[in-house]
């Protein structure tokens, strides 16, 4: 009997171990329903906020254009009104940010990344109103900014607000709802749910804690925010460029060359952004009055450009279909590209509340169209369509600048509904990303966050030294 005991106990022990393993797996997949419910609440609120923000920007832009119509007979007065309307709106946005919530300036995405790393505070009670109304001022004034920055930061702050209001405890709940709000914000800004999910997983991969709980919550939040957007808008593609032809296999090497061009330009563009930040900081020196006046001058310039050369101002969504259709000459494309590079640098680097996704999409479209027009002339045997290079270029600058090729590709596909171009877009985006990484370029948002944290550390050190000096006296 003693010799039989081990042979009888071994299967029993194995069965117990299997049962215990299955029990552990099932328990691990038990997501707290409270977090999932809160994720749905966050997604709904973020979607409504994004819709309100979008409608508010459109209303302000229409009012500004209406004011210009009333002065159309007097050209000098028309230019003056164009400058002043945009300048006043921009100054309003700059003043709110500098006076009440400096962390609401710029894109806001680095702030969310810092919060996910527990290195930046989330003061939703002041960021939400300042980012919302400040962004209305700058974007409504026609500045070259995108709405995705405000909606992502607003979304993350709404996630933290819901956490505090419902008094949920734990780091996992805080981190999950913050990420859920950010993803929902991007999805609602572009009517691109899959891009919102990928944005959190790819762009915020160093900060995002990938767990069963967090990914389920992000999915739910993105679904709800997209539903809210489509209830108040439409279910079609955000940018209507029509159905473009597919790229033949023997032309794919051209898209790799286009990716190389963006891989060179992306890191250079990032350096220009950071350099312009330093230059403009030397101009205002941290003084609120100088900062607001400088912002008004930049906003007024965008207002003038919006009247004289509309393609060079605004976020760029109106420009993309026109450029993709080939309605600009090569000389005009070069002018638009150079002008928009300058205005993007001025607007974004000045600390205005607004994003850079949309301006970069427009820049990528213009450069891609120009490349496509050259390719059409050089290789007539391929029967190329310049618009396909425009679509490929849209996401390539994002890929090279913020180092998120998947997000850029899926975002453009969802916005334009040209899924047949996924292969050339992958080639262009991957080429741009690899070359940008090979040349040592730093991702834009990571570089901005590093600057913010260095400034925060310097301020804390200065306060500590001042406190020590007071104690010694």
From Swiss-Prot:
Entry annotated with the keyword Cell inner membrane: yes
Membrane topology according to the record: Multi-pass membrane protein
Periplasmic-side segments: 70-76, 233-252, 310-329, 377-386
Marked site: Mediates proton transfer from the outer aqueous phase to the interior of the protein: 148
Keyword annotations: Antiport, Cell inner membrane, Cell membrane, Chloride, Ion transport, Membrane, Transmembrane, Transmembrane helix, Transport
Intramembrane residues: 109-116, 177-189, 193-201, 387-401, 402-404, 405-416, 417-421
Listed Gene3D superfamilies: Clc chloride channel (1.10.3080.10)
Keyword Protease carried by entry: no
Residue numbers marked as site, Mediates proton transfer from the protein to the inner aqueous phase: 203
Molecular functions per Gene Ontology: antiporter activity; voltage-gated chloride channel activity
Span of the annotated motif Selectivity filter part_2: 146-150
Positions that bind chloride: 107, 356-357, 445
Protein origin, superkingdom: Bacteria
Extent of motif Selectivity filter part_3: 355-359
Transmembrane segments: 33-69, 77-100, 124-141, 148-166, 215-232, 253-281, 288-309, 330-349, 355-376, 422-438
SUPFAM superfamilies xrefs: Clc chloride channel
Disulfide bridge partners, by residue number: none
Reaction equations catalysed: 2 chloride(in) + H(+)(out) = 2 chloride(out) + H(+)(in)
Localisation: Cell inner membrane
Motif (Selectivity filter part_1): 106-110
Family per record: Belongs to the chloride channel (TC 2.A.49) family. ClcA subfamily.
Database matches in HAMAP family: CLC_ClcA
Task performed by this protein: Proton-coupled chloride transporter. Functions as antiport system and exchanges two chloride ions for 1 proton. Probably acts as an electrical shunt for an outwardly-directed proton pump that is linked to amino acid decarboxylation, as part of the extreme acid resistance (XAR) response.
Protein name per the record: H(+)/Cl(-) exchange transporter ClcA
Gene name in the database record: clcA
């Amino acid at each position: 009997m003693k010799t039989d005991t081990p042979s009888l106990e071994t299967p029993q022990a194995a069965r117990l171990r299997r049962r215990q393993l299955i029990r552990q797996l099932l328990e691990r997949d038990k997501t707290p329903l409270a977090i999932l419910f809160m994720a749905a609440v966050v997604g709904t609120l973020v979607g409504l906020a994004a819709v309100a923000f979008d409608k508010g920007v459109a209303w302000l832009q229409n009012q500004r254009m209406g004011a210009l119509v009333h002065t159309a007979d007097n050209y000098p007065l028309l230019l003056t009104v164009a400058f002043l309307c945009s300048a006043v709106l921009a100054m309003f946005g700059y003043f709110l940010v500098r006076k009440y919530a400096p962390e609401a300036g710029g894109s806001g995405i680095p702030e969310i990344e810092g919060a996910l790393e527990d290195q930046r505070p989330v003061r939703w009670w002041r960021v939400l109103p300042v980012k919302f109304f400040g962004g209305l001022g700058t974007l409504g004034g026609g500045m070259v900014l995108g709405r995705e920055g405000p909606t992502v930061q607003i979304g993350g702050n709404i996630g933290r607000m819901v956490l505090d209001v419902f008094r949920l405890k734990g780091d996992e709940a805080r981190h999950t709802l913050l990420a859920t709000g950010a993803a929902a914000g991007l999805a609602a800004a572009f009517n691109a749910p899959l891009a919102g999910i990928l944005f959190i997983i790819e762009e915020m991969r160093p900060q995002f804690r990938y767990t069963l709980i967090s990914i389920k919550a992000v999915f739910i939040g993105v679904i709800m925010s997209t539903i809210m957007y489509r209830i108040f808008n439409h279910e079609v593609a955000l940018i209507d460029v029509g159905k473009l032809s597919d790229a033949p296999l023997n032309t794919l090497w051209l898209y790799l060359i286009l990716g190389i061009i963006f891989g060179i330009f992306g890191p250079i563009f990032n350096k220009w952004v950071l350099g312009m930040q330093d230059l403009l900081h030397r101009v205002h020196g941290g003084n609120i009055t100088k900062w607001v006046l400088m912002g008004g001058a930049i906003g007024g310039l965008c207002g003038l450009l919006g009247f004289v050369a509309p393609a060079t101002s605004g976020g760029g969504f109106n420009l993309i279909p026109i450029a993709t259709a080939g309605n600009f000459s090569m000389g005009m494309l070069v002018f638009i590209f150079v002008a928009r590079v300058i205005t993007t640098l001025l607007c974004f680097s000045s600390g205005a509340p607004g994003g850079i996704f949309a301006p970069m999409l427009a820049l990528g479209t213009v450069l891609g169209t120009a490349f496509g027009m050259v390719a059409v002339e050089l290789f007539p045997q391929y029967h190329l369509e310049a618009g396909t290079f425009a679509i490929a270029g849209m996401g390539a600058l994002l890929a090279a600048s913020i180092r998120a090729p998947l997000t850029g590709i899926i975002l453009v596909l969802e916005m334009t509904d040209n899924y047949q171009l996924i292969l050339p877009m992958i080639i262009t985006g991957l080429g741009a990303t690899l070359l940008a990484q090979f040349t040592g370029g730093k991702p834009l948002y990571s570089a901005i966050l590093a600057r913010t944290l260095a400034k925060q550390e310097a301020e804390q050190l200065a306060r500590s030294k001042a406190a020590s000096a007071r104690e010694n006296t």
